[in-house]
Amino acid sequence: VGFFALASLTLPTHAISITAAGSAYTQNFDGLAASGTGMTWANDSTLPGWSLFKQPVQGTAMSTYSAGTGSSNTGGFYSFGASGNNDRALGGLGGGAYFGSPDPGNLAGWMAVSFSNGSGGSLDGFQVSWEGEQWRNGGTASAQTMVFEYGLGSSFSTVTSWATPGGLFDFSSVVNGGTAG
């Protein structure tokens, strides 16, 4: 498993507040570390509103991440980018003990962003867009996919139903097979 992701609409204490219809939120991840391993990650704090979770128990909070260029095959959450460059991307590699050694093709973890309705009224929809980046080819013949889902609840662990709007919202690796790296 090479890539994985999840975005959610939940309402934790540090959720990103949407204060009016048509409000925009952007995140470029450039505030993440550009070098090092074992950096402290605190859900809803390192990046306000963002959380990292892993299997085997849904909702197990992660406490570390590393910076990388895609050259490592060690499973974990990463701040990907060129060495020493502050232009970052949040992602992960799904293998290894970090995620409880998931079987190939199984979900390894979640990257979740939380929003709350701070408008004082009803919000009847939302629009989502992002740019996916591939920082590593795991060498497998099949594409590795980040799946977009959303749910409503007071926290990640209280969401009982996740909606998957379809494959057009997912990101699949564009380079597959060949030599890993």
What kind of feature is each model-predicted range?
Residues 77, 82-84, 90, 145-181:
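Exoplasmic/lumenal beta-rich domain surfaces
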Residues 7-32:
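Boundary/junction segments of secreted and surface-exposed precursor proteins
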Residues 48-121:
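Surface-exposed, low-complexity/disordered Ser/Thr/Gly/Pro/Asn-rich loops and linkers
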Residues 103, 133-143:
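Extended, low-complexity, turn-rich repeat/linker tracts enriched in Gly/Pro/Ser/Thr and Asp/Glu
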Residues 31-37, 135, 152-156:
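Acidic glycine-/aspartate-rich tracts in secreted/extracellular proteins
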Residues 25, 46-48, 109-111, 142-144:
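Residues that flank catalytic or metal-binding motifs in active/ligand-binding sites
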Residues 123-137:
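A short beta-strand element within beta-rich, extracytoplasmic domains
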